[in-house]
C-alpha cells in the first residue's frame, strides 16, 4: 500500500511529519511522493492563523478531489488544524476518514490500518484520536525531509508565553523540554547521516530547560552538542528577547560553530502594543537586549518579525515601530498583518483594525525593511562570505546556496559561478560582486 504525505506549516510541524514517515515505513508501507499514486494521503496541517487554515483547507479539498476521481482510498488529517477543530473536520469534510490531534501522531499506523481495513469490510466509520498533547512522547526516530546536509532539531514542544494573539498554547500545549541527553544523542545521529547545518527550533528555544532543570539551559545544551559532534553550523530560531541570558550570549560569541545569527521575534516596540499583546518585557528591555547582542557579538545577524494592525494600534504606535525598524537596521525582518483568531484573548478586544489598514501598514513597513536590506547587502559587495552550496541551476548555469547570515526557506540566497560542479552540502567561499533585492551574486574563491 502506498502512502502519500502533504506537510504544511513551520519546521516544527515538518519534524512531526518526519516522525510519522518513520513510523509508516517501519510498519512496512511504501511512501510515494506522487499524490496521484497514493492509496492513503496524510495531510499534516498548520492552522494557527487564518492564512494557514485556508492553505490547509485548500489542500484537504485538493486531496478530496483525488479520492473522488482517482484510486485514493482514504484521507487522514493531522497537525494543528486537526488539534484545533477535532471531530468537526470529519463533519465539515465527509471525504476525510481520520483525524489525529498533535498528541496522537504516534497513532498514525493505527489510523491507517483502521481506515483501510474498515473500508475493505464496507464500514464507513471514521477514526478519531485526540490524546493529551501535554503527555505525548516527545521526539522519535525520523525520516529527514530536508536536504541531507541540513536538519532541524526540535528541543521542546508547546509554549507558556500566552501572547494575546496566539492560539499555539491551546493547540500545542504547555512548554515541555526534551532531556538534554536525548537531544545530544539525536544531534550525533543526524551528524552520522551527513548533516552539516543543525537548525535548533521550538516555540521558544530560549525557555529550554526551565521545566526540567529549573533554569534556562540553552547555552549548556549548545555547548554539549558542539562537544559531542563536529557539526560546523548550528543556527538558532525562535528566541525570545526576555530570555537572552549572558551565558547564551557568551556561548554564541565564543563558540565558532554557533552561527552569529539569531531569530528574535519582537512583534512590536510600542509599550502600549507590547502590553496589549501580553508580551514579556517592554521597549527598554528590548533595546537593551539588542544593544548587548550587538556589543558582545559585533558581527551578529538578527532576524525578527512584527505584527501590524493589532487591536488598538494607533498611528503613533505604528510610526514608533517604523522609526524603530529604521534605526535598528535588522538584517532580516518579516511583517505580518494581525490575524484575528478565535479562542485567543485578542479575538474579543475592542478597536479591531480595518483589513485594508493592516495591509497598508504591512506594505509600508516592508518597504522600509527592503531599503535596509538593500543598504546592508550593498555593503557586502567586494567581501567574501562563507556559503553552503544547495544546488546547481543548469538553466542559469550558476550554483546557489546560503551564507551563514541566511536561514533555510526564510532568508536570501547566494548565487555564484564556479569552474567546477560543487556538491550540495559543500562549504565554499564566495566573493560578492553584486546584489539584487535580498540575494547576493558572486564567484567562488575557494572550496573550504
What kind of region is each of these model predictions?
Residues 74-79, 84, 89, 192-316:
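Conserved SAM/AdoMet-binding glycine-rich loop
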Residues 348-448:
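Terminal RNA-binding accessory module
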Residues 183, 200, 236, 264, ...:
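Conserved, mostly hydrophobic/aromatic
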Residues 202, 238, 266-268, 304-308, ...:
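Active-site proximal loops enriched in glycine and acidic residues that flank catalytic Cys/His/Asp
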Residues 313, 327-330:
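Contiguous mid-protein beta-loop-alpha structural module that forms a pocket-lining wall or clamp
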Residues 47-48, 172, 212-215, 275-281, ...:
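Short glycine-enriched, charge-decorated loop/helix-capping segments at active-site entrances
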Residues 3, 40-41, 151, 198, ...:
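Conserved beta-strand core positions
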Residues 1-208, 247, 262, 284-291, ...:
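Proteins enriched for Cys/Gly/acidic motifs involved in redox and nucleic-acid/cofactor modification
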Amino acid at each position: 500500500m502506498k502512502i502519500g504525505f502533504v506537510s504544511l506549516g513551520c519546521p516544527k510541524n515538518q519534524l512531526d511529519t518526519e516522525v510519522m514517515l518513520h513510523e509508516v515505513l517501519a510498519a512496512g508501507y511504501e511512501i510515494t511522493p506522487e499524490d496521484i499514486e497514493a492509496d492513503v494521503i496524510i495531510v499534516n496541517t498548520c492552522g494557527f492563523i487564518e492564512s494557514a487554515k485556508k492553505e490547509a483547507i485548500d489542500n484537504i479539498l485538493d486531496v478530496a478531489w483525488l479520492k473522488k476521481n482517482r484510486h485514493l482510498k482514504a484521507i487522514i488529517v493531522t497537525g494543528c488544524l486537526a488539534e484545533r477543530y477535532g471531530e468537526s473536520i470529519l463533519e465539515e469534510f465527509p471525504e476525510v476518514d481520520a483525524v489525529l490531534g498533535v498528541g496522537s501522531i504516534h497513532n498514525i499506523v493505527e489510523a491507517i490500518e483502521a481506515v483501510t481495513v474498515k473500508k475493505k469490510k464496507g464500514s464507513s466509520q471514521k477514526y478519531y484520536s485526540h490524546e493529551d498533547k501535554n503527555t505525548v512522547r516527545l521526539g522519535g526516530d525520523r525520516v529527514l525531509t530536508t536536504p541531507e546536509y541540513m536538519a532541524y532539531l526540535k528541543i521542546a514542544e508547546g509554549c507558556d508565553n500566552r501572547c494575546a494573539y496566539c492560539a499555539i498554547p491551546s493547540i500545542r500545549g504547555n512548554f515541555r523540554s526534551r532531556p538534554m541527553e536525548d537531544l545530544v544523542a539525536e544531534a550525533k545521529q543526524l551528524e552520522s547521516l551527513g548533516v552539516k547545518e543543525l537548525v535548533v527550533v521550538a516555540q521558544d528555544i530560549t525557555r529550554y530547560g526551565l521545566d526540567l532543570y529549573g533554569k534556562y539551559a540553552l547555552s549548556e545544551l549548545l555547548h554539549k552538542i558542539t562537544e559531542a559532534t563536529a557539526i560546523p553550523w548550528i543556527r538558532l530560531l525562535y528566541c525570545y528577547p526576555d530570555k537572552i541570558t549572558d551565558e547564551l550570549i557568551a556561548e554564541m560569541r565564543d563558540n565558532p560553530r554557533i552561527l552569529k545569527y539569531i531569530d528574535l521575534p519582537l512583534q512590536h516596540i510600542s509599550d502600549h502594543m507590547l502590553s496589549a499583546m501580553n508580551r514579556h518585557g517592554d521597549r527598554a528591555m528590548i533595546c537593551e537586549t539588542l544593544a548587548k547582542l550587538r556589543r558582545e557579538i559585533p558581527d551578529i545577524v538578527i532576524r525578527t518579525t512584527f505584527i501590524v494592525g493589532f487591536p488598538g494600534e494607533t498611528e503613533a504606535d505604528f510610526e514608533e515601530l517604523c522609526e524603530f525598524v529604521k534605526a535598528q537596521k535588522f538584517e532580516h525582518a518579516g511583517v505580518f498583518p494581525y490575524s484575528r483568531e478565535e479562542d485567543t484573548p485578542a479575538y474579543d478586544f475592542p478597536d479591531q483594525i480595518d483589513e485594508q489598514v493592516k495591509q497598508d501598514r504591512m506594505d509600508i513597513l516592508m518597504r522600509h525593511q527592503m531599503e535596509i536590506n538593500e543598504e546592508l547587502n550593498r555593503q557586502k559587495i567586494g567581501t567574501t562570505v562563507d556559503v553552503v552550496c544547495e544546488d546547481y541551476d543548469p538553466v542559469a548555469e550558476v550554483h546557489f546556496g546560503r551564507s551563514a547570515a541566511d536561514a533555510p526557506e526564510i532568508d536570501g540566497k547566494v548565487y555564484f559561478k564556479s569552474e567546477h560542479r560543487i556538491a550540495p552540502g559543500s562549504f565554499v567561499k564566495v566573493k560578492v560582486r553584486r546584489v539584487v533585492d535580498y540575494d547576493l551574486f558572486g564567484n567562488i574563491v575557494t572550496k573550504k
